């Protein structure tokens, strides 16, 4: 539902539509500030500082909320940002060579494509400037917080690259991000309340699977 006048709406986005028709969401200026703050917290959780340069390997348009959020959060932290967008491995590697970014924001399966391109073109990716990637959209770890098949495949090829997993959704406009312990995403308690509920809307026991239920603050 929308609880402000249309003149208060600054940004229109939609969900990805993975499980059905995309759902439209709208944001006010204050919502965008909150979004920026969430990503600021996510970047600091991964250890990023204003000394880092972020290569943004996701779209910032196409009704995608998170691309703009990453840029705004990095700006709030004071990082340099290179808005390369998604795809085009040749452009990604040219950017890494030219600007020497230290951190990437990327869908992890695209890292496989970057590795394949580098190997075909004799690029020593383990010696490049990229130290870490914050990964979105796909799981990197299993329930025991060990790297899954995708995460392990990347790590085996590119062991010098730290992989940080995230969990987020358009609906909650917040994210859970790993720290350097790589043992699960951190809740941002000033932004959301999270519950894990059963079919009767009751909290599940410790270790049981439940519906992730978010209340935004």
Give the role of each language-model region.
Residues 55-57, 131-136, 212:
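Extended hydrophobic secondary-structure segments that form protein cores and membrane-embedded regions
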Residues 77, 99, 129, 158-159, ...:
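Short, structured coil segments at secondary-structure junctions
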Residues 49-51, 127-130, 160:
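A general structural motif
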Residues 15-18, 54, 104, 168:
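Conserved S/T- and glycine-rich ATP-binding loop of Class I adenylate-forming
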Residues 1-14, 20-37, 41-45, 49-51, ...:
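Nucleotide 5′-phosphate-binding alpha/beta core
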Residues 28-44, 53-113:
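AMP-binding/adenylate-forming
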Residues 145-217:
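Conserved AMP-binding/adenylate-forming
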Residues 101-150, 164-172, 195:
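Adenylate-forming
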């Amino acid at each position: 539902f929308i609880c402000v006048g249309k003149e208060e709406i600054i940004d229109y986005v939609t969900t990805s539509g993975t499980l059905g028709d995309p759902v439209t969401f709208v944001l006010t200026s204050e919502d965008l500030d909150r979004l920026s703050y969430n990503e600021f917290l996510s970047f600091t959780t991964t250890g990023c500082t204003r000394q880092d340069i972020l290569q943004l390997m996701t779209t910032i348009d196409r009704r995608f909320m998170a691309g703009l959020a990453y840029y705004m959060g990095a700006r709030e932290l004071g990082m340099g940002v290179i808005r390369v967008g998604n795809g085009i491995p040749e452009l990604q590697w040219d950017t890494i060579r030219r600007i020497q970014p230290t951190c990437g924001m990327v869908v992890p399966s695209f890292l496989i494509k970057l590795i394949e391109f580098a190997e075909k073109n004799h690029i020593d990716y383990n010696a490049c400037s990229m130290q870490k990637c914050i990964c979105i959209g796909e799981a990197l770890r299993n329930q025991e917080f060990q790297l899954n098949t995708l995460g392990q495949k990347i790590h085996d090829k590119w062991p010098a690259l730290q992989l940080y997993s995230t969990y987020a959704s358009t609906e909650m406009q917040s994210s859970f991000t790993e720290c350097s312990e790589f043992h699960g995403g951190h809740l941002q308690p000033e932004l959301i309340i999270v519950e894990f509920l059963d079919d009767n809307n009751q909290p599940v026991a410790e270790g049981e699977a439940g519906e992730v239920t978010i209340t935004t603050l």
